[in-house]
Regions:
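Acidic (Asp/Glu)-rich catalytic clusters
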Residues: 41-46, 138-155, 170, 226-227, ...
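CE4/NodB-like, metal-dependent polysaccharide N-deacetylase domain
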Residues: 175-212, 294-311
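Catalytic domains of cell-wall/extracellular-matrix polysaccharide-remodeling enzymes
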Residues: 189-247, 316-339, 343
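Short, solvent-exposed turn/loop segments enriched in Gly/Ser/Thr/Pro and often Arg
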Residues: 52-57, 157-160, 211-217, 348-351
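Positively charged, amphipathic and often flexible ligand-engagement surfaces
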Residues: 162-165, 174-186, 191, 238-240, ...
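Aromatic- and glycine-enriched glycan-recognition loops and surfaces
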Residues: 27-38, 131-140, 180-198
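Active-site and substrate-binding clefts of carbohydrate-active enzymes
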Residues: 1-118, 248-369
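Active-site-proximal, well-structured secondary-structure segments within enzyme catalytic domains
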Residues: 84-137, 147-182
């Protein structure tokens, strides 16, 4: 059985359109703490994965790298401790509650910007310098992983819109639809094309793969994505079961389908959600063994030439795990790599060997429904 892990990286635009100042620090925070960590762990374990970068996130990362982005949190970290204002102390106190000494508060807050199991011991100024180094090397580090065969890079429509609703809001189920029609396929097509082109400008190649925001797909979206140059997209198994006539066979999940000339992979919802929302409550070893047992059960049900796809947020879950998820991910990567009967793969690589053949009459949907 082939196995693909897809890690989704997304932050919306936090830049004020008038002042150009960053209102919230989350691009800064996740880039240094989590995107860097995911690249480090993949390289350390030589563990192949797929990483999905939203274009508007890339835009903001590059502004931080170039020094044109600043946010109140970063400004408070860089101030002389004696010049911290009450507002600065309150802001840093949200990261490090209970600390009243200004210098100590800054030191603890800047340490919180990093994944502690992967960070060398340095003082505040040393960590601020390290932050700049990490940001500057962030995107190149993923290109290096790609060159080593350890990373497939994919993207999303530019500003992370839910495409079926942009193409036609009437594609949504339910009674709570706006009275006025909303149908702007031209905007959806523009965001697909703009996102793919911007990704290509930054990384030097245009991506084959697409994670449509929230896994939002429809026949119209699939047609537009294919026309924009994407060869495959990913969504949730919920969409597969809505689109396939009953009875549903579990093995149907473990292969790609064709919709409007676009290959579609459907993620395993249970396994993706266990990593996102459940395993942080478990001891790492027990969580990994439970995950492996579920993988083995799926392999037995899937048959030959099958692929199991796991897609989840690659940034937010880890703060709820001990050690920012590092001990768990190390254990998971090590155990999965040693599993017999599984091959870690890229989605494009799988399609090259096993092209999608079965057509699917795609029903509009997202991972939510």
């Amino acid at each position: 059985m082939h196995l693909a892990f897809v890690w989704h990286f997304h932050q919306p635009i936090y830049r004020d359109p008038d002042t150009r100042e960053y209102i919230l620090p989350w691009v800064n925070y996740h880039a240094v703490k989590n995107y860097h960590q995911m690249a480090r762990l993949a390289e350390e374990a030589e563990f192949p994965g797929t990483y999905n970068f939203v274009p508007c996130l890339l835009e903001q990362v590059l502004e931080y790298v170039g020094g044109s982005a600043n946010d109140p949190f970063q400004a408070a970290l860089e101030k002389d401790p004696g010049k911290l204002t009450y507002a600065d102390v309150r802001l840093l106190g949200k990261i490090v509650p209970g600390e009243t000494n200004a210098r100590r508060l800054q030191e603890l807050a800047v340490k919180a910007l990093f994944s502690s199991p992967l960070t060398p011991e340095r003082d505040r100024d040393g960590l601020l310098d390290l932050r700049k180094e990490v940001l500057a090397d962030l995107l190149p580090s993923y290109l290096r992983l790609r060159q080593k065969g350890l990373a497939e890079l994919t993207t999303t429509p530019y500003y992370h819109p839910i495409l079926p609703l942009v193409f036609d809001v009437r594609s949504a189920d339910g009674d709570s639809l706006p009275e006025l029609p909303f149908r702007h396929p031209e905007d959806g097509k523009s965001q697909l094309a703009k996102g793919r082109a911007y990704f290509g400008k930054i990384f030097g190649f245009e991506p084959a793969g697409l994670w449509p925001s929230e896994g939002g797909v429809s026949r119209e979206v699939a047609r537009a994505a294919s026309a924009a140059g994407f060869r495959f997209a990913l969504t949730d198994e919920n969409v597969l079961w809505k689109s396939r006539p009953a009875p549903h066979v579990p093995a149907d999940l473990f292969k790609p389908y064709l919709a409007e000339s676009l290959a579609l992979f459907f993620r395993d919802r249970e396994l993706s959600d266990l990593l996102s929302f459940e395993y942080q409550k478990w001891p790492a070893a027990a969580a990994v063994e439970d995950f492996v047992a579920k993988l083995e059960a799926r392999r037995k049900a899937a048959g030959e030439a099958s692929i199991l796809v796991i897609v989840l947020d690659g940034e937010n879950p880890w703060e709820y795990y001990p050690g920012n998820g590092v001990p768990f991910l190390r254990a998971l990567y090590d155990r999965v790599k040693r599993l017999e009967g599984f091959t870690l793969t890229s989605l494009a690589g799988y399609l090259a060997a096993e092209p999608a053949r079965d057509e699917i009459d795609l029903v509009p949907g997202t991972w939510l429904g």
